[in-house]
């Protein structure tokens, strides 16, 4: 049976997962580890009934307990999709392996689907990532905020906006990031106010731990619940007493380069999905491309419907 150790590169994927049957067996191995699990009632058994069509078994089971029918794709991002699993696997592999991602205009050429289909596939992948973000914030958490968007000077003269300097929200969307033990959590926020910044930190970071920020006024008062270390960049401070925000600022560089270089433009509506995409790659940077691919398949349990995406 095809298994995770066989996929170490895109060539391995194409060589070992040539048919829909190969892909189905691989996904069953990743998700079920050899024993089918009913997604309806959770029953795990080798005695689930295998249903055939014309005498051929194609992965359709009937639960011996709840009697519901299921396949390995039910309850996953692949459920209800008419796109062959091999195309899905190729899309997922290159999406995760490329440090800055891949655009829908490129993907649709690579796997021979329409650009609209490629865009929806990438959105489904990001959506699945979004609902599997699980980070434990340790003893020290770096916190910072940044702004995602274009520059006013690059707009056509007739479309330039007034009063867009500094932290103006007319052109750019504020994004907040928290990094601890090498893992980053990213969340778009309405504005970088004290009330919002404190709210996010209080909801995620255990009280009494150390929080490191820059000198932005929105972080004032954190010392009431945390050991608050401030590295004031305006005073030329970048490392203070061993504390810094260099790691989260390095992540911002990756995020911005990826959006500008590959996607060019991201709307505020979908910004959260793109932030989660880059956070997932960052958080799994110590895995090989094959390991990251297999890990993603094991957690890809959220299905995004098209109407949810465009509303």
Give residue ranges: language-model regions:
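Residue-level recognition of single "structural anchor" positions
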Residues: 1-311
């Amino acid at each position: 049976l095809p298994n995770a150790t066989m996929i170490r590169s895109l060539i391995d994927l194409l060589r070992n997962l040539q048919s829909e049957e190969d892909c189905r067996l691989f996904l069953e191995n990743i998700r079920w580890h050899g024993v089918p699990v009913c997604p309806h009632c959770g029953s795990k058994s080798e005695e689930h009934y295998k249903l055939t069509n014309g005498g051929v078994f194609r992965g359709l089971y009937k639960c011996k307990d709840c009697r519901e029918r299921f396949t390995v794709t039910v309850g996953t991002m692949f459920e209800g999709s008419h796109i062959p699993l091999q195309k899905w696997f190729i899309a997922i592999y290159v999406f995760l392996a490329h440090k800055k991602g891949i655009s829908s205009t490129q993907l649709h050429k690579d796997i021979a689907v329409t650009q609209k289909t490629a865009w929806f596939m990438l959105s489904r992948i990001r959506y699945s990532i979004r609902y599997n973000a699980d980070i434990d914030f340790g003893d020290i958490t770096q916190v910072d905020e940044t702004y995602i968007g274009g520059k006013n000077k690059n707009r056509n003269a007739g479309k330039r906006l007034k009063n867009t300097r500094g932290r103006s929200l007319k052109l750019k969307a504020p994004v907040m990031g928290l990094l601890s033990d090498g893992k980053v959590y990213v969340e778009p926020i309405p504005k970088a106010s004290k009330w919002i910044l404190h709210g996010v930190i209080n909801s995620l970071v255990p009280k009494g731990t150390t929080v490191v920020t820059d000198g932005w006024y929105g972080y004032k008062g954190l010392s009431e619940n945390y050991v608050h270390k401030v590295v004031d960049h305006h005073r030329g401070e970048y490392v203070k007493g061993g504390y810094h925000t260099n790691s989260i600022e390095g992540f911002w560089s990756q995020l911005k380069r990826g959006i500008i270089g590959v996607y060019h433009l991201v709307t505020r509506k979908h910004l959260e999905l793109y932030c989660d995409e880059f956070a997932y790659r960052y958080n799994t940077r110590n895995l090989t491309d094959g390991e990251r691919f297999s890990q993603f398949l094991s957690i890809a349990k959220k299905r995004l419907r098209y109407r949810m995406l465009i509303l």
